[in-house]
Every structure is written in C-alpha cells, then in structure tokens.
Amino acid sequence: MTPNEQYSGGLPPLVPSAPAIDPWNWPPDSGWSPQRNLIGYHVKATDGNVGKIDMATHAQDASYLVVDARRWIFGSTLVVPAGLVSVIDHSEQNVYLICTKELVKSAPPLKPVDGKFTNRPDRDKLARYYRAALSR
C-alpha cells in the first residue's frame, strides 16, 4: 500500500499529543537560524533516526527539510515541513522532530517542481496530513 493509499483510507498512525503546528515555518524556540547550515545534520523522530539533511529552506510559509532516508527507506528522499522540528542541537548536529518515524514515512509524497518542493496542492495535502495526525 502506498503512503497516499494509507492516508486516503483513514487517519495516519497515532502519535503522542503535540501542540498545533504551523507546518511551513520554523518554530520560534527550535534553535533554527538562517545563518546556520543544517546540511548533513541527522534528523531524529521521537522513536529513532530518519536520515540526514540534504537541503533546508527558510522562506516564509515555505520552510522545509529535504531528508535523505535511503538507509531507512530504500531510495527515499523525504520532505519534512519545518514546523515538525522541536529542537536543533547544533553541537551534536541533530534535528529532533515532534513525531514518529512511521508518521514521516506514511506522509503523502511531495514532488519537486524545478528542483523545489513548492507545489501548492501537494504542500496543502501534506500540511493537512500532519495537522490531522498531530491534533489527535
């Protein structure tokens, strides 16, 4: 079953309760700064490693991480909205998420347009997915 089939067939996997998120903006207390390069940092969900950051954006209402998850999901690159970041540990080069690996893995895919993940309908679908999952 594909991630889209899983999502369209019901709610995503349950995760611990989390505050409402603004998916496409960095949380103000996350430790994010446009002066810091996050490429190569490890991304960690609440239950383990997701992958390494290949790209991080900081555009208003369009911030996200592109994560190389090939060691975990064969051949996969994932887009993780910046609003899922709880904290960034610059000394250890780790980015911690507010959700589980399964939630990230089951998310609807976001396809690049001209090398950027800015397709509005896909972004809206991804935002709805995470809001629904994290508000339960």
What are these regions (language model features)?
Residues M1-R136:
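Peripheral interaction segments used for macromolecular assembly
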